[in-house]
Amino acid sequence: MVHLSSEEKSAVTALWGKVNVEEVGGEALGRLLVVYPWTQRFFESFGDLSSANAVMNNPKVKAHGKKVLAAFSEGLSHLDNLKGTFAKLSELHCDKLHVDPENFRLLGNVLVIVLSHHFGKEFTPQVQAAYQKVVAGVANALAHKYH
């Protein structure tokens, strides 16, 4: 569960309504793979990840980023039950994919950076703080199966 004030919930919802999930998702996942190259081991089937340019222009990275952000978007509709919302994804990433749960936190932080880049002054310190709470809650929910 993420504890957000009504103002924080409104800020998150208002900004999210303007997010291009495909564009932001691809950019966030791409940046994760570039900045934290060890995360690429989970995406060997994606083809060329040999350079930042290759990663950022890789159609499979973009498609998976969109998928990740679509799941995140679903979570925003269930802020009071993130563990339940992400239970199956947590199980998949833990039991089958063996993803280090720290990667969820890293991706959340990268997402906040990408949102800041896309929305500039509209991404105020208050909005940023609310999104930090949300991405921390999502990362915690995704890591739940690991505990």
Swiss-Prot record:
Q: Which InterPro entries match?
A: Globin, Globin-like_sf, Globin/Proto, Hemoglobin_b, Hemoglobin_oxygen_transport
According to UniProt, the tissues expressing it are described as: Red blood cells.
The protein's superkingdom reads: Eukaryota
Task: Name a GO molecular-function annotation.
Answer: metal ion binding
What is one Gene Ontology biological process annotated in the Swiss-Prot or TrEMBL record?
hydrogen peroxide catabolic process
Q: Which GO terms describe its cellular component?
A: blood microparticle; haptoglobin-hemoglobin complex; hemoglobin complex
Indicate what this protein is called per its UniProt record.
Hemoglobin subunit beta-1/2
The protein's organism comes out as Oryctolagus cuniculus (Rabbit)
Q: What is the lineage of its organism?
A: Eukaryota, Metazoa, Chordata, Craniata, Vertebrata
